[in-house]
Amino acid sequence: MTTIQAHIFKSLFSLLLIFGLTVVASAQPNVAKGMEQTISLKVSGVCGECKHRIESTAMDVKGVKKAEWDIKTDMLVCVGSAKMDKQKIADALAKAGHKSELAAADPKGYANLPACCQYDSGADKH
């Protein structure tokens, strides 16, 4: 092999190596995104104030990146990392006074809810 051929070979090898590393590096964010999960949980509430409390309480749980509660269906949808845990979300909501399909509301938490948010008192959704 001549020195010119060796130089061309080294240059091509270097370019392929750089290209390969670039492809691998750009794929990493997609791998991390794939590790996100979505959790749905039925949570009782009746109003906009409940919505704010439910969503902010869920957001305080480790791993939750987004929380959206639908007043019509009582469904809370959380998006977050693989570390997000459905039971931990339900437990945090129970402590805040909201029952869910996984946990009963803490009596103290429920008693501390504003009167308009006490969903078991027969309050209509508003």
Which residues does each PLM region occupy?
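Helix N-cap motif at beta-to-alpha junctions
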Residues: S81-K86
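Short acidic amphipathic segments
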Residues: A58-D70
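Boundary of Sec targeting at the N-terminus
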Residues: A27-Q28
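Short, surface-exposed ligand-recognition loops at beta-strand->loop->(often short) alpha-helix junctions
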Residues: S40-C50
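N-terminal secretory signal peptides that target proteins for export/translocation
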Residues: M1-H7
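Conserved short beta-strand edge segments in small beta-sheet-based binding/regulatory domains
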Residues: G97-G109
